[in-house]
From Swiss-Prot:
Organism encoding this protein: Escherichia coli O1:K1 / APEC
Name by which UniProt lists this protein: NH(3)-dependent NAD(+) synthetase
Catalytic reactions on record: deamido-NAD(+) + NH4(+) + ATP = AMP + diphosphate + NAD(+) + H(+)
Pathway: Cofactor biosynthesis; NAD(+) biosynthesis; NAD(+) from deamido-NAD(+) (ammonia route): step 1/1
Cross-referenced InterPro entries: NAD/GMP_synthase, NAD_synthase, NH(3)-dep_NAD(+)_synth, Rossmann-like_a/b/a_fold
Residue numbers binding ATP: G46, I47, S48, G49, G50, Q51, D52, S53, T160, K189, T211
Gene name tied to this protein: nadE
Gene Ontology biological process terms from the UniProt entry: NAD biosynthetic process
SUPFAM superfamilies for the chain: Adenine nucleotide alpha hydrolases-like
HAMAP family: NadE_ammonia_dep
Length: 275
């Protein structure tokens, strides 16, 4: 088995999907989890205005709507969380995503004050954050806020990780990577677009250039620039297609060096890092 085949198997990626079937699969997955643990009353998700959170948010709200109707349990809710750092550059996209999702509840937590306070506390301890590390600080502050909200609403935090993100480890460890449940896991980027199109999402929300937008020195840096490969390249690779040798090397290098991000904390029983 080639490394490409191993990666595809591990991530559960498929070369082709039926959008309606995958929508149903994700909704039923969320509903099943909530029904298994009836003490869970809310799904909590940060909404950025990008493709992934828009899709995950819509699926969460659909799952909650169905469960309320089927069980009569009106205490169930989906909470969409706005998490700007100061003023969000693509604010209108975020508003459009909220309008599309129609969440039960919308909360806004501006993380800038908390990030600056943390940065100052570290500075006083003699640690000056680089712009890149400050970006990770933002991602972790966003997740901290979501877990606080989940804790106060008997909720779980929903993630947006999918195969095209997991393969490159393109997320912050214990930031956007630190979630409870990931309904998009298995899909690649273009497949996520297929689901949004089937759901009637405004096209500009899934046709925009994806960006983590964490760095102050490089605002709105496209993911594809940071990764050195395009999402079309990554999706082709995940679908088992032949890609240029350099592209395959880049993707596989990202996969191998970020393996620790896809695993629980390393213990004495782990040996993947020795290979």
């Amino acid at each position: 088995m080639t490394l490409q085949q191993q990666i595809i198997k591990v991530l559960g990626a498929k070369p082709q999907i039926n959008a309606e079937e995958e929508i149903r699969r994700s909704i039923d997955f969320l509903k099943s989890y909530l029904q298994t643990y009836p003490f869970i009353k809310s799904l909590v998700l940060g909404i950025s205005g990008g493709q992934d959170s828009t899709l995950a948010g819509k699926l969460c709200q659909m799952a909650i709507n169905e469960l309320r109707q089927e069980t009569g349990n009106e205490s169930l809710q989906f909470i969409a969380v706005r998490l700007p750092y100061g003023v969000q550059a693509d604010e209108q996209d975020c508003q459009d995503a909220i309008a599309f999702i129609q969440p039960d509840r919308v909360l806004t937590v501006n993380i800038k004050g908390a990030v600056l306070a943390s940065e100052q506390a570290l500075r006083e301890a003699g640690i000056e954050l680089s712009d890149f590390v400050r970006g990770n600080e933002k991602a972790r502050e966003r997740m901290k806020a979501q877990y606080s909200i989940a804790g106060m609403t008997s909720g779980v935090v929903v993630g947006t990780d999918h195969a095209a993100e997991a393969i490159t480890g393109f997320f912050t460890k214990y930031g956007d990577g630190g979630t409870d449940i990931n309904p998009l896991y298995r899909l690649n980027k273009r497949q996520g677009k297929q689901l949004l199109a089937a759901l009637g999402c405004p096209e500009h929300l899934y046709k925009k250039a994806p960006t983590a937008d964490l760095e102050d020195d490089r605002p709105s840096l496209p993911d594809e620039v940071a990764l050195g490969v395009t999402y079309d390249n990554i999706d082709d690779y995940l679908e088992g297609k032949n890609v240029p040798e350099q592209v395959a090397r880049t993707i596989e290098n990202w996969y191998l060096k970020t393996e620790h991000k896809r695993r629980p904390p390393i213990t004495v029983f782990d040996d993947f890092w020795k290979k």
